[in-house]
Structures are given as C-alpha cells and as structure tokens.
Regions:
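Short beta-strand
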Residues: 37-43, 66
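Short amphipathic beta-strand starts and helix->beta connectors
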Residues: 29-37
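Short glycine-/aliphatic-rich beta-strand segments at the starts of folded cytosolic domains
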Residues: 1-27
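Short cationic amphipathic helices and targeting signals
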Residues: 15, 45-51
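Helix N-cap motif at beta-to-alpha junctions
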Residues: 51-58
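Glycine/serine-rich phosphate-binding loop and adjoining beta1-alpha1 elements at the start
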Residues: 64-125
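Signature of alpha-helical transmembrane segments in polytopic membrane proteins
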Residues: 36, 60-61, 81
Length: 125
C-alpha cells in the first residue's frame, strides 16, 4: 500500500541522455506512455518530465527530481519563464504550451489531476 501512495505522488524529473542519438526514441517513448502518462518538455537546454511515474528508459539518467509541491512549483516556474536564461523568455513559454497540447492530445481528460496541474501552469505563461 505504501508503495502505491509513493507512485501516485506528482513528480518532476530533469533527465540527462547518455548519448544524443537516444533523444528521439526517448521522447517518443515518453510521449506515448499509456500506463502512467507524463508531460514531456524538451528544449535545447533541458529535458524535463512531469507526472506520477517515470517509465523505464535506457540511456537516460536523472539529474534532478522534485516531488509534490516542489514539482508543481518547478513546472510553474518553467511555464512562467522564471528558469530561463532570459527571464520571461517567450520561446520556453511556447514550448510549455506545446508540451501541454501534446499531452492533452494523447491522454485527453483521462488524467484529470495531471491535466489540471498542467493547465494552471500553462496559464502562468
């Protein structure tokens, strides 16, 4: 029972790819994950994933992990452009909106809690 509660906690991960050639297959796998969907934010500067559980991935390591309120705060800060090299950078905000659209297109309203978190974050940008 305790493990299930752990898996249901909202999380954010900053990922590092062991090799750049893994990028496209990793992104495809993350974006189509059915069992525990995640929002994937891939920019030239970062690869971040938001959801409840990170699927098993080869050639990927976790650089940072945030849980619950800190994960929500992380997504909000990214969406608002506060973590960009240039404060409020519009390009990152557009990438966040596109990541949310991609998530919603694949997973729709089946994951209401995640959808609500992502909607609120996107509204900050």
């Amino acid at each position: 029972m305790h493990q299930t509660n752990q898996e249901n906690r909202f999380r954010a991960w900053e990922l590092l790819l062991d090799r750049e050639e893994f990028r496209e297959s990793t992104l495809r796998r993350l974006r189509t994950e059915e069992e525990s969907p995640v929002l994937v934010l891939a920019t030239c500067q970062r690869l971040e994933v938001y959801g409840h559980r990170l699927p098993d991935l080869e050639g990927v390591s976790i650089r940072h992990e945030w849980t619950e309120a800190r994960a929500v705060e992380r997504f909000a800060r990214i969406a608002a452009g506060l973590e960009s090299r240039i404060l409020g950078e519009l390009e990152v905000m557009g990438q966040v909106r596109q990541a949310y659209k991609d998530f919603h297109l694949v997973h729709g309203a089946n994951w209401q809690e995640l959808d609500r978190i992502f909607q609120q974050g996107v509204s900050l940008g």
